[in-house]
């Protein structure tokens, strides 16, 4: 591929990077020169980091952060984190080098499969429903499952992304929001499709994506076939008003309508607006369950499996408390 030892490039060491799968530590030896890849995966990380670091500098995506570090002297775990950050801040422009596109696709596909396998390859249709796990009666008990774990490992017709109005991902390296994680696992193809959608809005004289709707895209390297994006309400200071409740309910209705109308068999839900958008989880959970129940009552023939994905045990407990009440 004509790749040579990279020059010393600015390393954004002050930028927090997302967590990545653990890599056996490689202790750098200042007298040994460049670190040599030991596996095909490390070789792929090496060439991709070089390519996207050079791409970022050439296009002005990154500022100079001292001190300059030669990329091939970084341990591979650090290079992978750096690559994650470079992809996070990268605008949705084409990847011109076909070899690099193929290498990136191969890396992301392998990592996504490994993440799913480590999580037990969860399948939305195979998860026990609330009737079994929590004794919930009616349509809610028969159609809905509650799962604790990483939404991006779920095999489903679609998973839900809590997007912002620009629809291009979080763009902040290391930020742990679901928007960032979904784009990181899915890969640049997702941002490119979202950019195309937003370009269409701009051509029609429309602005940011409104709150309370749903947009369907491909899933790319996610186990899920699609992503349903929704922009939730922003709650300042944790004070929930009627308009916030109305808009959050609209998000979930739009998600379920989109899944049903598209003919999906299942959808994995994240907790919309409860992160950086400030909606208290304890107030959101009962509203989510109520909205799902009302939607199921209005669609008695639906066979849609709905999986509520709780990120942590604490989040799961919030939903279980709402179910108990």
Positions of PLM-derived features:
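Macrodomain-like recognition of ADP-ribose-binding/processing modules
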Residues: 2-325
């Amino acid at each position: 591929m004509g790749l040579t030892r990279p020059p010393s490039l600015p390393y954004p060491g002050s930028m927090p990077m997302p967590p990545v799968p653990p890599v056996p530590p490689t202790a750098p030896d200042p007298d040994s020169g460049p670190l040599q890849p030991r596996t095909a995966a490390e070789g792929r990380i090496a060439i991709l980091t070089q390519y996207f670091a050079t791409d970022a500098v050439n296009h002005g995506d990154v500022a100079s952060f001292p001190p300059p570090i030669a990329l091939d002297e970084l341990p591979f775990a650090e290079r992978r984190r750096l690559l994650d950050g470079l992809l996070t801040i990268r605008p949705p422009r084409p990847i011109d080098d076909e070899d690099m596109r193929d290498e990136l696709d191969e890396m992301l596909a392998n990592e996504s499969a490994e993440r799913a396998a480590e999580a037990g390859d969860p399948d939305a249709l195979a998860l026990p429903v609330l009737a079994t796990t929590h004794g919930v009666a009616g349509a809610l008990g028969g159609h809905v499952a509650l799962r604790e774990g990483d939404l991006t490992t779920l095999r489903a017709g679609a998973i839900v992304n809590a997007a912002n109005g620009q629809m291009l991902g979080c763009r902040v390296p290391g930020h742990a929001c679901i928007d960032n994680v979904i784009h990181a696992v899915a890969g640049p193809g997702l941002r490119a499709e979202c950019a195309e959608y937003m370009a269409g809005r701009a051509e029609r004289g429309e602005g940011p994506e409104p709150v309370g709707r749903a947009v369907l895209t491909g899933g790319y390297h996610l186990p899920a076939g699609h992503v349903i994006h929704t922009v939730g309400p922003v709650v300042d200071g944790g004070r929930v008003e009627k308009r916030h409740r109305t808009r959050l309910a609209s998000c979930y209705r739009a998600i379920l309508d989109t899944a049903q109308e598209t003919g999906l068999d299942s959808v994995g839900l994240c907790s919309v607006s409860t992160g950086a958008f400030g909606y208290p989880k304890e107030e959101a959970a009962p509203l989510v369950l109520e909205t799902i129940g009302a939607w199921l009552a209005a669609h008695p023939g639906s066979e849609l499996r709905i999986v509520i994905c709780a990120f942590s045990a604490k989040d799961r407990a919030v939903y279980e408390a709402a179910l108990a009440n």
